């Protein structure tokens, strides 16, 4: 299993461990993807298995189980709360949406959910996930985040490791314990509103990437494909010009690679927040939209702005269909570039392992894949450059594959307007 890399040029975060409750019974009913792999193949993990499943419109959301909620105008909304929950001194009525069970066709070891929602003041959502083994054992419902767009009277947060015999949580990622494999998974989203209020959050889409990857070793280097010579015009932003700024959001600089990269792809699509949304940023501040992204993607439990799902949820506020997944190769990234879609990619590498990088090494960093040279080298916007002028970089294809596929397992944020079609899906769909 891959180790989750949490911060570049720093130490990994240590998360508090809490006991997880027992799960209720249930049985998988939905099947997608390839036929189930054998137990032997799963244990060897010799193949890069990645699958993505989402419910992204009203018809799809109606396939879930509704409790105190209804689907109206393409979104799940609270209709008649099924209970009242006290959270940090306030009382909230709540309803739920629960996905069908999904069989990806292999024994998964990691999962990262994503969602798109609107949360008016006084509302928020909680996203949970559980899995089932071939023997029928259920993991607990583990929280992957309490989330809201706003932060004046609510703090979006992850809740720690939540360890049980089958799973644990590392920030935004559900991971199996030891040699456990989950052959089916399920999502649950709880919608909250202030008790007595009629204002509801709106869940417009939710899904998850699940994967089972080989252990260790360098990534195979693919030959250049059909995106050779295509470089997308992605605006350049440096995270380092924010060094030492806004200590309440982890001091900018090296901690802001993710919101800076998210800002770059939003700028590419001309979907940045309106200036009226960042009037709280002081006058004369350079790139205030980056500070806005850092604030509204900030995870107060993790104490950082690098939560993958919180970044795509932030991007979803601005008319984009955004999610986290893994790609299996640089060739798959080329398919997105050919379709006109830049990617935010998570990488890690040691000193001297990525020529032309603005940093010596990192145990977790995000940048934007924006294209390829005629010879297949990877053209990126790397926000770790000292200024916007140095953000555009060209990396060797083999070294980048090792840093990206070998580092995070190929994690990307896919951010695009819903009207922009995705590339044709693979036989084991991972987008």
Residue ranges and their predicted role:
Residues 1-37:
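Secretory targeting and sorting signals
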Residues 190-304, 430-431:
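Active-site-adjacent structural segments surrounding the nucleophilic cysteine of cysteine proteases
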Residues 8, 49-90, 101-106, 122, ...:
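Noncatalytic regulatory segments and standalone regulatory/sensor domains
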Residues 15, 33-60:
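Intrinsically disordered, low-structural-confidence terminal and linker regions
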Residues 158-182, 335:
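Short, surface-exposed tryptophan/glycine-enriched loops
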Residues 90-92, 99, 280-431:
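Conserved active-site-adjacent core of cysteine acyl-enzyme catalytic domains
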Residues 106-119, 349:
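A short beta-strand element within beta-rich, extracytoplasmic domains
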Residues 42, 48, 137-161:
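Trp- and S/T/G-rich repeat-edge/linker motifs of beta-rich repeat architectures
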